[in-house]
Amino acid sequence: MSFYGTSMIFDGVSCEEMGLVMYDFTSNRQSATAFASDLEIAEDRIDGRYRSLFYGGAVNAPLTFTMVLCASEDRAERNEPLDRWDLQKIAAWLTGHREYKWLSIVQEDMEEIRYRCLISDLQAVEVAGNKWGVSFQVTCDSPYAYLRPMVYDYMVASSLTTTLRSESSHNGFYYPKLAITGHTGGDLSIRIENRMEASSFTFQGLPSAMGDLTIDCENGVITSASGLNPYQYLSYDTPFHFPRFARGDNTITMTGSGRYTFTCEWPVNVGG
């Protein structure tokens, strides 16, 4: 799948700052391109059985695609190909990173979408012996792109039930970032239940000195503003899960006074 936009932003830097624009060298003939990672099927087939022994399927392969950046039209009209100093500047921008960076494509239907990726296999694009651009491989951290952060903010006096819709393409659970703030008074109990499953996330007897809580639900990391240890107040009287959302509508009940702020970067299957 190709992009029709002419500009991209990687690690906060636009390709236009490098005097480059996005190019698509494919022809105009009809074609079909994959836009979703393949399903990995785990199964065995044995003689005498027409059905497989099916163990499950998973989408694990990261999303990968190739991009091309070439000199802008103004530079081409001036007949100024890229020199070695231009190439080293581009290489320093795109490659050698030790962690995933955000990539955004500037086009109308991708304003809220971005990729978390690394760039490799950087190659010069040559025409008539001159270097006019670069091509490279984009490797994402998952099979998906991501919507920009969406914040769901709830003020709870005692208990509140609401519907939170997951926009995720992933056919499984999504784990958000969660902040619990503004609780005052004496010891506090907090409970978050998702009626999509028979489990809950519960604190019992949190001291008022604990302060605000920040919870990375995906990695199971809880930090408090006071520096006190919040893990000792977790309750396992019911099946326990860090807050998580299934695809589609989720009915969430929050019990315990305070402000609950969920931050979600929904994974979406839009290809590359």
Where are these regions (language model features)?
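Polar/acidic, low-complexity leader/linker segments enriched in S/T/G and N/D
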Residues: 1-43
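Extracellular Ig-like/FN3 beta-sandwich strand-entry sites
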Residues: 62, 98, 245-249
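Short beta-strand and beta-hairpin "edge-sheet" elements
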Residues: 100-144
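Oligomerization/assembly interface segments of phage tail-like spikes and tubes
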Residues: 44-45, 50-81, 130-144, 250
